[in-house]
């Protein structure tokens, strides 16, 4: 299911934040507990069709969750797609990382996830803002095909656009 892809993307992000000293502890535990959502307060992607957010008026439970229970955990509850991917599906993959001062202040004040978040180090990044990478994919019989050109991801690739 796509929820597993979301969890893996969150774990990869946590590992990167650990390298910067912003997070600590076991990445899988941090994601399970919801500590990653300080930086990743949204889902990983959604299905596309005739419209960008196709069929959302029907309700996410019936489109992206097929009637299964949806998480109520902050961050995870914003994931719009949890069903197994099938050939022919078109969906977005849009991981991101944000530093939201109000959310940082709230969680720090509540001493939330102190075992996973180094709030002193987070303060150094509080005015960074955020970034989100969005690419669209077609699910095929053998995997997935990116729709459109590869976007620059590394600092070197981004700087080369100048």
Where are these regions (language model features)?
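Active-site neighborhoods and metal-handling regions in enzymes and metal-associated proteins
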Residues: 1-162
